[in-house]
């Protein structure tokens, strides 16, 4: 189960790009970085769970490889032209101390799922409205 989420600690809000919960009780946090400047920006790299990963393309990885902490893993995204693409884990993370409770992470995941469902419903309603308008014009 995974969804984008926002976590709040007593000082500020942070958005984790992707949060995954495994049935074994393990939380994995993923930060997606699309450019080297995005990787190096002052925006937080939020690794709240037991394991943290960056999701990068090979070009970015080659430029920031030495800046990645030892305990953070890396997934590389490959997307050749005319292909669905794939991902490969090129660096395994080390287990870290979780920065917030299981309950807080679960609540954040549930909130994110609710937000994503609402977005899905809104888009579906837009599509249905567009289809109805096309039918009326015939």
Model-identified regions with their sequence ranges:
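A short acidic/basic microdomain associated with nuclease active sites
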Residues: 1-11
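Residues in well-ordered beta-strands of folded domains
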Residues: 3-4, 19, 75
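Extended interaction regions within the primary functional domain
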Residues: 6, 40-44, 94-99
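Generic preference for well-ordered secondary structure
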Residues: 14-16, 36, 58, 93
């Amino acid at each position: 189960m995974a969804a984008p989420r926002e976590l709040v600690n007593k000082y500020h809000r942070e958005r984790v790009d992707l949060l995954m919960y495994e049935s074994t009780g393990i939380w994995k946090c993923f930060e997606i970085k699309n450019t080297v400047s995005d990787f190096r920006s002052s925006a937080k790299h939020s690794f709240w769970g037991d394991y943290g990963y960056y999701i990068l393309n090979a070009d970015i990885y080659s430029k920031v490889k030495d800046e990645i902490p030892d305990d953070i893993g890396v997934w590389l995204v490959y997307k050749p032209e005319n292909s669905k693409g794939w991902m490969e884990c090129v660096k395994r993370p080390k287990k870290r101390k979780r920065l917030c409770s299981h309950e807080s992470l679960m609540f954040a995941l549930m909130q994110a799922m609710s937000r994503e469902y609402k977005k899905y419903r809104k888009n579906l309603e837009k599509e249905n409205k567009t289809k109805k308008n096309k039918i009326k014009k015939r």
